[in-house]
């Protein structure tokens, strides 16, 4: 798992909110 993947996921979740 890459850090970028995690950050991208967090950004996606936060962006969804």
From Swiss-Prot:
Any single GO CC term annotated in Swiss-Prot or TrEMBL for this entry: extracellular region
Keyword Ribonucleoprotein: no
Coiled coil: none
GO MF: toxin activity
Valine amide, modified sites: 17
InterPro entries: Bombolitin
Compartments it resides in: Secreted
Pfam families: Bombolitin
Primary subcellular site in the record, as a coarse category: secreted
Alphabetic keyword roster: Amidation, G-protein coupled receptor impairing toxin, Mast cell degranulation, Secreted, Toxin
Membrane spanning residue stretches: none
Tissue and organ distribution: Expressed by the venom gland.
Annotated family: Belongs to the MCD family. Bombolitin subfamily.
Function comment: Mast cell degranulating peptide. Its mast cell degranulation activity may be related to the activation of G-protein coupled receptors in mast cells as well as interaction with other proteins located in cell endosomal membranes in the mast cells.
Protein name: Bombolitin-4
């Amino acid at each position: 798992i890459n850090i970028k993947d995690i950050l991208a996921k967090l950004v996606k979740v936060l962006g969804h909110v």
